[in-house]
């Protein structure tokens, strides 16, 4: 392999695409079942009540409700709180 630059060659010109990670639905926002709440690498956030975890550590809602962030045993957890239907009068 040549270690000197040949005519009109360059060592630059490569860049990877962004992974678009992060929180997609914030605390208090309404989500439907299956909606992605957090895209992450590793378990920065852990799944709580009514939240599932995909094989790439993505957190998603298992049921419709409002997103709630909190702590449990020193871990940051994401919960989905179901809406309680108002009693019919």
Swiss-Prot record:
The answer to whether UniProt assigns keyword Ribosomal protein to this entry is: yes
Q: Which domain of life is it from?
A: Bacteria
Q: Which PROSITE patterns match?
A: RIBOSOMAL_L27
**Entries under InterPro entries matching the protein:** Ribosomal_bL27, Ribosomal_bL27_CS
List, alphabetically, the SUPFAM superfamilies matched. Ribosomal L27 protein-like
The Gene Ontology terms for molecular function here are: structural constituent of ribosome
Please cite one Gene Ontology biological process associated with this protein. Answer: translation
According to the UniProt entry, which residue ranges have a biased composition of type Polar residues?
7-19
Q: Enumerate the transmembrane spans.
A: none
* One cellular component term from this protein's GO annotations in UniProt: cytosolic large ribosomal subunit
Q: Which UniProt keywords apply?
A: Ribonucleoprotein, Ribosomal protein
**Residue ranges, annotated region (Disordered):** 1-21
What Pfam families does the database record attribute to this sequence?
A: Ribosomal_L27
Among PANTHER family, the record links this protein to: LARGE RIBOSOMAL SUBUNIT PROTEIN BL27M, RIBOSOMAL PROTEIN L27
Q: What family is it from? A: Belongs to the bacterial ribosomal protein bL27 family.
Q: Which HAMAP family match?
A: Ribosomal_bL27
Name-wise, this protein is: Large ribosomal subunit protein bL27
